[in-house]
Structure formats: C-alpha cells, structure tokens
C-alpha cells in the first residue's frame, strides 16, 4: 500500500503543478480535466487489502461488488471510475488520506480477475483505455516509483515541443533517507 501511495502522491503532485500553470495555453486551473490516471492491477483475489483500502478511500473501488461470473460467464476484469479530491499522505510506511481540498484527479481502475503479468496490463491500458480516451501522450509508471514533482510535466513538454517524438523515458533515482543507507557499502554502490 505504501508503494502504491508513493506513486500516487507523485502523480497527484504533478497534476497539481499542471493546474497551477496559469500562464500555460494547455494547462492551468482546469488541467485536471485533461488528465486521466489509469490503474491496472492483476488478480482481484491477490491485491493487497491495504492497497484496496487506499483505492476505496480515493473513491475508485468498492469492496464486495465485483463478481467472478455474470450469467455463467467468467468475468475478465472490473472497471471503476471516479473523480477524487482526496489527498494521500505518507509517513514512513503509514498511509493516510486527506478527505478535502486536494486537486481533482480523474481515476480509472481496472482490476483483472487473473494474473496475466505486466505486459498484459500494458495491453489492457493501450487497447481498452487508449481507444476510448484517445490520449496525446501516455506515461507508464510502476507502483513504487515516485515521479518527481514536475517530471510528468517535463515529459509532456518534450512531446509538445517535438511532435515527431515516439517515446521517451525518465531517470530513476534511488530514494535515500538523508544518506542513512550510505553506511551499507552494497547500497552505497
């Protein structure tokens, strides 16, 4: 749950920064309406209960509604949608939610019934959501990866400045707690 929360905090912060770009022709106060955060998770029976609780707190998941079969046919996935204004805080590994005042974020949550791995999740994103949303750019982030406060904006800006770009990747840095881990030579290298 805290890895998921770490990622969502970074994504939410990026959306907030885009909403605060008042002089931008593309972004600004209503920027959140141009961004959809899609979350794809494998296997309903195996999703971390605390992560489910965070998703429920954000309003994009309801426990007990999903069924394995409908009319005798296996269900492939469950899709939930919600625009949340709930914020997330993280202290160490303790996740807490702030019920008011956060920048709105449009969320789509796809919970697959069976484990099909990451590439299948990417296919779900591009083939299912991509066709419906018709996005200008897509940013894929693994749970646990925390995007910098304006890194998604800068990634978008690269595509905006050069429309012939087909793909880009960002830099990943190790999160250190003020150098504490540097005492361990395996971590320091």
Swiss-Prot record:
Transmembrane regions listed in the UniProt entry: none
According to its UniProt record, which protein family does this protein belong to? Belongs to the chitin synthase family.
CC terms in the record's Gene Ontology section: cell septum; plasma membrane
Output this protein's name.
Chitin synthase 1
Q: How does it sit in the membrane?
A: Multi-pass membrane protein
Pfam families referenced in this protein's UniProt entry, alphabetically: Chitin_synth_1
* Reaction equation(s) it catalyzes: [(1->4)-N-acetyl-beta-D-glucosaminyl](n) + UDP-N-acetyl-alpha-D-glucosamine = [(1->4)-N-acetyl-beta-D-glucosaminyl](n+1) + UDP + H(+)
Enzyme group, top EC level? transferase
